[in-house]
Amino acid sequence: MYAVFQSGGKQHRVSEGQTVRLEKLDIATGETIEFAEVLMVANGEEVKIGVPFVDGGVIKAEVVAHGRGEKVKIVKFRRRKHYRKQQGHRQWFTDVKITGISA
């Protein structure tokens, strides 16, 4: 059984027991969260597709950890003009473990 849900403006395909990295959520580690924006649920041959969301579709998950991703370097450079600019960015994330899918 798997499902597709929406969180942080992105869509994620998950199955039970899987750990997913999402955009940062303001929820403490160890707490549970329910995602109601379920776009699709598939159980073998039976597939439910939402318009836009599946009625009664809920994905339950437990927050495992928070952290920051790898550093991305941004470089601006103009040749022959003595202009160089560097900037770095590390995006916050939340790891969640899917504990249940229902539709």
From Swiss-Prot:
Any Gene Ontology CC annotation: ribonucleoprotein complex
Residue ranges that the Swiss-Prot or TrEMBL entry lists as coiled coil: none
Listed GO MF terms: rRNA binding; structural constituent of ribosome
PROSITE patterns for this protein: RIBOSOMAL_L21
Sorted UniProt keywords: Ribonucleoprotein, Ribosomal protein, RNA-binding, rRNA-binding
Source species, domain of life: Bacteria
A Gene Ontology BP annotation from the UniProt entry: translation
Stated role: This protein binds to 23S rRNA in the presence of protein L20.
UniProt similarity note: Belongs to the bacterial ribosomal protein bL21 family.
HAMAP family: Ribosomal_bL21
PANTHER family listed in its UniProt record: 50S RIBOSOMAL PROTEIN L21, LARGE RIBOSOMAL SUBUNIT PROTEIN BL21M
Quaternary organization: Part of the 50S ribosomal subunit. Contacts protein L20.
UniProt name for this protein: Large ribosomal subunit protein bL21
Organism: Salmonella schwarzengrund (strain CVM19633)
Gene: rplU
